[in-house]
C-alpha cells in the first residue's frame, strides 16, 4: 500500500543523509502541484493517492487543520515541515510504548498485548496481518523507519486511538439512554477531551431526538393506548396531527432533549466511581466488570432524572391545552398525585437496563472483534457504514430484549392520566396486556421505534462528526 512513499523516503534518506527536514522538503514540493508554495486539502488528497497512500476518511482535513497555524486553509512550507516534525515525535513515542522489549522492532505479540490493554482481543493471525500492512521488508517485524513511513500521514498519534474508532454509545443516540458509558483514557481526562466528546455527543443526541420526535411520540401513544385505532403508523400520525396540528408531533420532545445533559453527566460520574470498585489489582477492567459498572451507572443516572421521564410521557400522551408546558405538567402531577407519581414505572425501567445494556454491549463487542479479525487488513478504522451497522444491530437487539419492560414502564407512567384506567402494578399490567392483547401486545409500538433507529443513528453520527471538528477533537 505504501511502497511508493516508502521508496521515496528511503531513497531521499540514502542520498541526503538522515536529515528529516530535507526529506520533508522534497515531499512538500512533490505535493505542491501548482507550485504556489502551499499545499491544500485537494493537493494533499491527490498527491497521497498518486503515491499509493490510502489514508482514513477525513485524514487530509485533520492534517491541514492540525498544521494550519495561521488558519488560511493551506499548509505553507513552514507549517508543513513543523507538522511532520511534531507528528514524527508523537509517532516515536507511540513506537517506543509498543516496543516493550526495547529491541527496536515491533512484533506480533507486542501488538496483541497493546490492544488487549485497550479491551480488544485479537488472534496471532490478525496481529500478523496488521504487521504485514506496515512491513516493507517482509521480516514480520516493524522497525522505526517502517512505522514512521506507514503513519506519516495518519493523523492518529498513538495506538490508543484505534479504540476511539469503536466508541459508540455517546455517538449513536436512539433515544433510550441505557447503553454502557464510554471509556476515556487518562490523557483524554487530563487534556479535557472527555468533556468535549460528551458535549459533542449531547448535541448529536439533541438533534437526533428532535429529528425523530414524531416517531417517538407515536411509539408512546401506541404503547399507552394499546390496540386502539392508532395501531397503524400512518393512521397514528394522522390522528396526532388532527388532534393538535403539526406541532403536536413534537410534544414532549423538549423534556427529552433537556434531560440529556444531567443524565450524561450523572452517568459519566457514576461510571467512574463504580469502575474504581470493580477494577482488578492489575488496573484492568474486563468486559464483565465494565458491564456491571455501566449498568449500575445507568441505574444511578436514571434514578436522578426519572421524574423527567414521567413528564416526557405525560406531555406526549396529553391532549392539546392540557398542559401549558413542562413546569405546568409537573405542578399538576404534584397537586393531584403527590411526589410518588414522579417514580411510577421506576422498577420496570431499572430492570430493563440489564437486558438492554448487556445485549447491546455483547453484540457490539462480538461484531467489533469479528470485523477486526477478518477485515481490518490495512487500517483499524472500520468506516462509517460498519460503525452504523454495528451500532444499529446491537441497539436493535437490546431493544427487542427490554421492550416489554419499557412498554410496562410507559403505561405505569401514563395510566393515572387516562380517565377510568385502573392503577395496576407491574405484575398486574403484564397479566392484563397478555390476557387482552396477547404476547405481541408487549411489543405494541415497536414498529415506529425500529423505524426511527436508522435515521436517529445516522443523524447522531453526522452531527457528532461536525461537532468534533468545531470543538477541535
Curated annotation (Swiss-Prot):
GO terms for biological process: adenine nucleotide transport; cellular response to calcium ion; mitochondrial ATP transmembrane transport. Activated by an increase in cytosolic calcium levels that induce a conformational change of the N-terminal regulatory domain, uncapping the channel and allowing transport. Inhibited by bathophenanthroline, mersalyl, p-hydroxymercuribenzoate, bromcresol purple and tannic acid. Residues 1-173 are annotated as: Regulatory N-terminal domain. It catalyses: Mg(2+)(out) + phosphate(in) + ATP(out) = Mg(2+)(in) + phosphate(out) + ATP(in); ADP(out) + phosphate(in) + H(+)(out) = ADP(in) + phosphate(out) + H(+)(in); AMP(out) + phosphate(in) = AMP(in) + phosphate(out); phosphate(in) + ATP(out) + 2 H(+)(out) = phosphate(out) + ATP(in) + 2 H(+)(in). The chain crosses the membrane at residues 198-215, 252-271, 295-308, 345-364, 388-405, 445-464. It is found in: Mitochondrion inner membrane. InterPro entries: EF-hand-dom_pair (IPR011992), EF_Hand_1_Ca_BS (IPR018247), EF_hand_dom (IPR002048), GDC-like (IPR002167), Mit_carrier (IPR002067), Mitochondrial_sb/sol_carrier (IPR018108), Mt_carrier_dom_sf (IPR023395). Ca(2+) 4 binds at residues 135, 137, 139, 141, 146. Keywords: Antiport, Calcium, Membrane, Metal-binding, Mitochondrion, Mitochondrion inner membrane, Repeat, Transmembrane, Transmembrane helix, Transport. Ca(2+) 2 binds at residues 68, 70, 72, 74, 79. One of its GO terms (molecular function) is ADP:phosphate antiporter activity. Ca(2+) 3 binds at residues 99, 101, 103, 105, 110. Residues 174-473 are annotated as: C-terminal transmembrane transporter domain. Ca(2+) 1 binds at residues 32, 34, 36, 38, 43. Residues 159-168 are annotated as: Linker region. Residues 1-197, 272-294, 365-387, 465-473 are mitochondrial intermembrane. One of its GO terms (cellular component) is membrane. Belongs to the mitochondrial carrier (TC 2.A.29) family. Monomer. The regulatory N-terminal domain/NTD formed of two pairs of fused calcium-binding EF-hands, binds calcium in the mitochondrial intermembrane space and regulates the antiporter activity of the transmembrane domain/TMD. In absence of calcium, the apo form of the N-terminal domain is intrinsically disordered and binds to the transmembrane domain, inhibiting the transporter activity. Binding of calcium leads to a major conformational change and abolishes the interaction with the transmembrane domain and the inhibition of the transporter activity. This is Mitochondrial adenyl nucleotide antiporter SLC25A24. It comes from Xenopus tropicalis. The gene is slc25a24.
